[in-house]
Amino acid sequence: MPCRLLHQRETRSGGPRGPRHSAPTGPGWHNAPTLQSWEESHAPSRDPRDHQGSVEDTSLGGDAPADGVSPSVPPLQGLGKAAGPGGTGQAECQVVVATHRANLKPWDGRAAPLGKRTEEGRLSTSSCASVSRNKPDSVPQGDPVWPPESTGPALCAGEETEPQSSEGLAWGPWAQPWAPSLCPSQTGTASTASPQRASRLALQGPPGTILSLSSSSPCLPPSHCDPGAASSWAGLQSLKLLLQVSFQGAADGCSLRDANTNRKGPMHGSDFPPRLCLHSMSLWGSWGSRPPSPAHSREVAS
């Protein structure tokens, strides 16, 4: 299923608003928070606008005001369709992905894809990835990701369902079940939390953030790590290529944020320590009809 259009941004007069405006507030944010069942989230889209579009006007942001995200950002909201038929306003989609060392296999064909290039060179938005949440009915107001500092292993795995098979680039939950006991807390100890139900959820939020990764404490020495630790680090290396290709280098200098050090840098795994349990990932984009700029295309090619 494609990532559905989440909202239609409008001016106070009711007309469509372009993608370069600041994050909307008030009536421009439609749709009350909603969780879809797994079956509903896999239902085929009936709106061709959900399938097409290219990344436009996106740049790295973060969850702090210093990174350009206003603290007055409205609450994150749930999956929904853009208001009104035939609208032309920009729609944005954020995908928050629960990841774990045991399932970092970006090229696994069983995964739900985030997107793939079409023959015309545009990006076709695909399935909204699955989210395992330890807060069943709410998310922190105005926060683009669940901060591990306040929630511990915020997005550890619980129950999982076989994702929909798909062609193209893949990133998401995997077919094998995850054991919650494998996901370490901030102190590196095993989580004793009961299994959490995995739900498919897309969230709205301020435009601008390409990727935000939060991770737990490193596992030192390596001999104390779970068997999946090595594959986790390999998966993080592959994530760079995956995002560069699937998002066509939409932002110059796409960056990773290390939540433990608050460090940001180019999307190269060697710039960051091999964190072992990735709590959350958020992808933001303004989906429009304009193709990527030549500079962005060159970034991908390089």
Swiss-Prot record:
Composition bias, Basic and acidic residues: 39-54
Residue stretches of biased makeup (Polar residues): 123-133, 183-197
Highest taxon in the source lineage: Eukaryota
Segments for region (Disordered): 1-167, 180-199
Protein name as it appears in the record: Uncharacterized protein FLJ46757
Organism from which the protein derives: Homo sapiens (Human)
